């Protein structure tokens, strides 16, 4: 497992715990957020081999564009962006990052 993959595992696991316990989201909502985050993670690691801490705004924009080009509904695009933004907001709140690439 690469360093980037390890960081994705660590931070996505912490994020899952956060949205499940501290935010108290319903199980279906947690699963939807995690599914969207896995989709984003797959895009980032397959194309760029980046850890979540190395992602910059153009990568997020390219990911959203890929959803559009794949014919994803606008509601799917918005929900996915919301999930990715929530993940990066979590990293900001926990002082892991200073700036979100999903702003």
Describe each region flagged by the PLM.
Residues 2, 13-28, 34-103:
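N-terminal core-binding DNA-recognition domain of tyrosine recombinases/integrases
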Residues 1-8:
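N-terminal leader/domain-start detector
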């Amino acid at each position: 497992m690469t360093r980037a993959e390890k960081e994705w595992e660590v931070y996505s696991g912490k994020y899952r715990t956060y949205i499940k316990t501290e935010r108290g989201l319903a199980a279906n909502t947690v699963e939807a957020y995690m599914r969207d985050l896995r989709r984003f993670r797959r895009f980032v690691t397959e194309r760029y081999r980046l850890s979540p801490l190395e992602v910059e705004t153009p990568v997020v924009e390219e990911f959203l564009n890929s959803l559009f080009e794949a014919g994803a509904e606008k509601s799917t695009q918005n929900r996915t962006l919301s999930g990715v933004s929530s993940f990066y907001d979590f990293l900001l709140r926990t002082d892991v990052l200073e700036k979100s690439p999903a702003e």
